């Protein structure tokens, strides 16, 4: 289901996107083409982790408040798929908080956006302590609430590095959900009342290359 972009069309020199109207950021600011242009230009910055994914984009053009065009330096039929990794920021919020450019991980920089955010999604970030706890609460003004009704009002995300400790927290009821439980623990989890496991096939290939030279 399309989200911030409702439709998109290809042309010889790029892609044109029609943006969803009526979307607001968590602080109430309107989502417009200006935010999309800002976010893509930010993603192209040298310190950005996403610059390789959008490197074929040579320019971002505003057609109107809810239409933008990504001009590419050549044909790129899979660009829309790549764009799912580029997150749209509120340009006004970013400028007000001095995060017009991405943080520089190589220089161990930490900016305001490391612990704060202002998105458009169903959950609002209330607090974040990296490697400790992130707390999110339901966004009462989310544009997609009628299409994707949910039943969760608050999320507490606690990173637990040790797999055994993570599974123990699940079995004791300390946490409600864990990602990627160890294979050897799946049967024990499935045998516990109130717990279920979900598995999916991974979309990847693993190969061994033999040096025959």
Describe the function of each predicted region.
Residues 1-13, 41, 118:
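N-terminal lobe/hinge region of extracytoplasmic solute-binding protein
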Residues 1-4, 29, 79-91, 120, ...:
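A structural "hinge/loop" feature
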Residues 92-96, 110, 138-139, 146:
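Extracytoplasmic/periplasmic substrate-binding proteins
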Residues 5, 9, 84, 147-148, ...:
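Short capping/connector residues at structural and topological boundaries
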Residues 106-116:
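Short aromatic-glycine motifs in intrinsically disordered, low-complexity regions
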Residues 13-16, 20-51, 59-62, 114, ...:
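Extracytoplasmic/periplasmic ligand-capture domains
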Residues 2-6, 53-57, 120-122:
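Short structured motifs
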Residues 9, 18, 52-102:
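Surface-exposed binding/hinge segments that line
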